[in-house]
Curated annotation (Swiss-Prot):
Protein name, as recorded: Versatile peroxidase VPL2
Organism: Pleurotus eryngii (Boletus of the steppes)
Cited SUPFAM superfamilies: Heme-dependent peroxidases
Catalytic activity: 1-(4-hydroxy-3-methoxyphenyl)-2-(2-methoxyphenoxy)propane-1,3-diol + H2O2 = guaiacol + vanillin + glycolaldehyde + H2O; 2 Mn(2+) + H2O2 + 2 H(+) = 2 Mn(3+) + 2 H2O
One annotated GO molecular function: reactive-black-5:hydrogen-peroxide oxidoreductase activity
Disulfide bonds: 33-45, 44-308, 64-144, 272-337
Sites where a glycan is attached: 126
Residue positions assigned to the propeptide: 23-30
Amino acid sequence: MSFKTLSALALALGAAVQFASAAVPLVQKRATCDDGRTTANAACCILFPILDDIQENLFDGAQCGEEVHESLRLTFHDAIGFSPTLGGGGADGSIIAFDTIETNFPANAGIDEIVSAQKPFVAKHNISAGDFIQFAGAVGVSNCPGGVRIPFFLGRPDAVAASPDHLVPEPFDSVDSILARMGDAGFSPVEVVWLLASHSIAAADKVDPSIPGTPFDSTPGVFDSQFFIETQLKGRLFPGTADNKGEAQSPLQGEIRLQSDHLLARDPQTACEWQSMVNNQPKIQNRFAATMSKMALLGQDKTKLIDCSDVIPTPPALVGAAHLPAGFSLSDVEQACAATPFPALTADPGPVTSVPPVPGS
């Protein structure tokens, strides 16, 4: 056989092997944990017992209730303690490790309760406080209908110092002040809007202490766009007492509106992005998951962490559709985005109703 013929045969065999490799999909290897569950990385197996424990004993049997709301709040209050100029370790668990310092910051009012609830789980399991806070937040959101699987990375080292004070935005701060603080931490104005999808499953205890557990929208147990709709409605009342710092009038009895949410929904820097979230569940889910993942990595070296995102449960499907509350019409919308029309929504039938407090608050 001539060298020319041999070369041609080798090329043909190489092409055939290459074609076969392309045609046969690679089989992704998965680790089987002691309890039979599988994950992409064996190091993630330690999370399954923690998952079972918090679903049963922190989240009351995998509910989307008060402890989920507070755990999600804690992810932000821990992570946003980060500034390239002012210091802070970001998502490092310092709010638990140095709780006697950080829970006394004015912006962290009331957060001592969820810190106290989570500390025994951190002590019980082989996990750092920084990892536990972000893991619990991601698991909690997955309990909510319409929720998302927030990516989770394992391996944050223990915090070495408390966060500086004054890094958590307050509800009475101006839009410019909030965007400046968030910009310092690496977030654009639109990412601030995306993060605020968290208020779809949130409530306030301390803005008006007379009405603890008052939600920010009418569906606090569902991760949906009602928060973005209802913050654009004309305010009619204060659900409790008036003249509370950081509170604006709400459209519904039993629903509280933060002054910061009211202003961000109407500010030229954020209004159109805010409106774009209305009745756009895929966008809310995708943007929130991506931005929460970014926040959860503040102050961390991602290359040193392990991707354990597949441990996070799949959330229940969204129930219900975007709507105006009963008794409201599109004329009640204070539209601040001139670039696009406000989405066409219908109102629930019946008279105006009130929103009950979040159970367990």
